[in-house]
């Protein structure tokens, strides 16, 4: 499978955005409760795809695995940009 030189479009449904945000919040709290550094663990999962970065505690592992990692990254980028005053469409 090769790469193309043309730009590919990616679109996430608005309903999924809210659910991803809620899931990340719940996973963050579960990681925190277990004594992990939530940011490091979530980054580890997103970069590697290895669900072992997220514990089964409070069903956090199953919750985060409902979404593709690229969907999670899109939501994180959108949230960051909006928080910095950029009107993201």
From Swiss-Prot:
InterPro entries reported for this sequence: IreB (IPR009309)
Transmembrane segment boundaries: none
HAMAP family: UPF0297 (MF_01507)
Xref: PANTHER family: UPF0297 PROTEIN YRZL (PTHR40067:SF1)
Family: Belongs to the UPF0297 family.
Protein name per the record: UPF0297 protein SUB1776
Organism: Streptococcus uberis (strain ATCC BAA-854 / 0140J)
